[in-house]
C-alpha cells in the first residue's frame, strides 16, 4: 500500500429532487476539495455525477489539479439511480486497485455519497449486490470507508 495516498470518490446526486440544493452541493464539494488540498500527503479525486445515468467528471485526478465545480458542471435532471452510481464507482475503483502494483494502491479509500433521496431508477445493481461489493472491498483492502451525506 502506498503510504500518504488517499483515494476520494465523490458520488453526487444530480437528480431532479436535488433542485434547490445545487448551491449547497457545489459549495460542499468545493469546500471539501479545498480542505483536502491543505492536508498532508497526496489525494486522488474521482467525481461521479448521477441521475438515471452516471457521468465521471474526474477520474483519479491529483487533488491539486481539481478545479472548483460550477453550475456549468452540476445541474439537476432525471431520476435517482443511486445503486447504479455506487456500484459502478466501486467496480471501477476496485478494478484499478486490483490490477495496480501493491505499492501503488492507496493507503486509504473514501467514498463520499451526497444525495437527498431514495433509489428509484437503478437497473444494473440492487442493494444486496452493492452491500456485498462494499464488504468485499473492506475485506480486501481494509481501509475503505463510505460516508453518506443527506
Segments predicted by a language model, with ranges:
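Von Willebrand factor
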Residues: 2-59
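Conserved small/polar residues in nucleotide/adenosyl-binding loops
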Residues: 147-150
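Exposed acidic/Ser/Thr-rich ligand/metal-binding surfaces
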Residues: 6, 86-136
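Phosphate/oxyanion-binding active-site loops and adjacent basic polyanion-contact surfaces
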Residues: 21-25, 78-87, 122, 126
Amino acid at each position: 500500500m502506498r503510504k500518504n495516498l488517499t483515494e476520494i470518490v465523490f458520488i453526487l446526486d444530480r437528480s431532479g429532487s436535488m433542485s434547490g440544493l445545487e448551491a449547497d452541493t457545489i459549495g460542499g464539494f468545493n469546500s471539501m476539495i479545498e480542505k483536502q488540498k491543505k492536508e498532508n500527503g497526496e489525494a486522488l479525486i474521482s467525481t461521479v455525477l448521477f441521475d438515471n445515468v452516471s457521468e465521471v467528471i474526474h477520474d483519479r485526478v491529483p487533488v491539486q489539479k481539481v478545479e472548483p465545480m460550477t453550475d456549468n458542471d452540476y445541474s439537476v435532471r432525471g431520476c435517482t439511480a443511486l445503486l447504479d452510481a455506487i456500484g459502478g464507482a466501486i467496480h471501477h475503483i476496485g478494478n484499478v486497485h486490483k490490477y495496480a502494483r501493491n505499492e501503488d494502491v492507496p493507503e486509504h479509500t473514501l467514498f463520499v455519497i451526497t444525495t437527498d433521496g431514495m433509489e428509484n431508477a437503478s437497473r444494473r445493481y440492487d442493494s444486496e449486490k452493492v452491500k456485498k461489493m462494499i464488504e468485499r472491498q473492506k475485506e480486501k483492502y481494509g481501509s475503505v470507508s463510505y460516508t453518506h451525506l443527506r
